[in-house]
Amino acid sequence: MVAGVVPSAGELAVFCRPVVTAPAVVGRGGGVRAGGWLPDFVRLGELERHLGDGVIEEVVAAAVEQGRLRGRQRRRLMSYPLLVRLTIAMTLMPDASYCEALVRLVGLLADVPFAREWHVPTEKVITDWRRLVPAGLLESLFWRAAGPLVEDGPGAVRLAGMSVCAADGMLVNLADTPANRAAFGTAGTSDGSGPFPQLRLVGLAARAGRAMLGAILGGTRAGEQTLLKRLVARRPDLVAGRVVCFDRNFPGHDLIAAIVDAGGHVVARVKAGIALPMEPDGWLPDGSRMTWLNAPSGRAADRLPVRAAEHNVVLPHGDGVQVSDTCTLITTLLDHRVAPADAVRATYLTRWSTSETTFGEDKTTITGAGDRTSGPVLRSGSPRLVIAEAWAWLTATQLLRASAAAALNSQTAAARALRRTNNTPVVADEESFTAVWRHAIHAMTTSQVTASSSLDAHAAAAEAAARAALHTLNTPGRERHSPRVQKARPKFRHTIATKTTITGTPRVTVFAPGTS
């Protein structure tokens, strides 16, 4: 077959996929090689399309200019941009070693004859390069990727006209080294005898698209409430104009006051032992009541006014027995006409599918981690490398959700037909995080789409990502059928303590004024 000539029917044709676009270098013997150096062409595939081509190079260049990173002129087996991409990629490949992750990242580029030869370096070389890169560089990259991914549509969850986000925290098991134990500690033990040292992560996740708005890292000695206060103090813009939901481990006068001062509002559950005094004539028509949170100073002038709503939650058990519990929510939205008790309750219920699902996908889906004894999530053996790896992990999962959000925005009639329903658009809660993650790994090893790639290559990559994200769909609003495992450390190390299994949808009743 002659190049440029359309083959006739039945004639054998060779179909080729472009791997890289590079200037040709012709040797004396007539051999053709690709000009350039292989590490300069490595990309993160589908993930880098959403981060932006050249962003990693910009962050590296800024670190060199600021003196945080030493510039390197001579070509070596590694480069700073390649190392950053490898750190991000290896967080999505928990089963791969450094070298195996690099081989997957390089992908088809390894088959391209480059003018300058390159081979996979040893793990020691990769580790030495990791020690050169400050954790702040990966943190800067995370903040470039963080932020809302999906605009709130007409059917989005909003309260008092504001978008909703959720704050939550999780503990991440680390490699068991003396340095990690000394730096991070182990939660739930006073003597540090837990099976693994742990990193505490607190983040803000948007309800729309479950995007990570911001995050902060710390050891186990700092509680979730302390870390969230630090995050709000550093970045008050994250909560401004938003309703922040969190569970009963977070509420406190200073934290809630800080969120309100930043321009946000709070919907939170409080523990049963928290005293919420009744204001005179405090009952409101929607069943909520006016109360306040006492300040640490104890002065009445420093009290924080809030509105409380008690709800009776009936949990149907699998054997037909109903378990009843009382749940008290508080909110800083004091006008019951703007935020009635039913709307406050409905908003709080979205917390599970926002922060709980987001953190569960990040930790459990990718790494297979379950309870606190299931093994390390992050592999680094020194505290500085742990922090860098954690920021890379958060960046990677944010880019996965950016890919899922892009699939939602590009739905065609054919994509909607995949639902086998009434041809309606797919919503974010139906997308499979696992499917998006697996496709990202596949695209990382088979496609190196860069800014110089053709428009057809970009369109093909976007179409493949959307097809993978929309092909396998979850059922939104699924009921829980698994035992709830207690977070408290069991008395004996082989004991698994569980709570009641919930197999039905809770029925919620708002207390009427004057009821007990």
Residue ranges, per PLM feature:
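Single, function-defining residue in the core of a domain
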Residues: 2-100, 104, 131-133, 140-144, ...
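Short Pro/Gly-enriched beta-strand edge/turn motifs at strand-loop
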Residues: 183-188
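Extended, structured, electrostatic nucleic-acid-contact surfaces
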Residues: 107-116
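Major-groove recognition helix of helix-turn-helix-like DNA-binding domains
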Residues: 115-132
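Noncatalytic, basic helical substrate-engagement surface that gates or grips nucleic-acid strands
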Residues: 122, 166-167
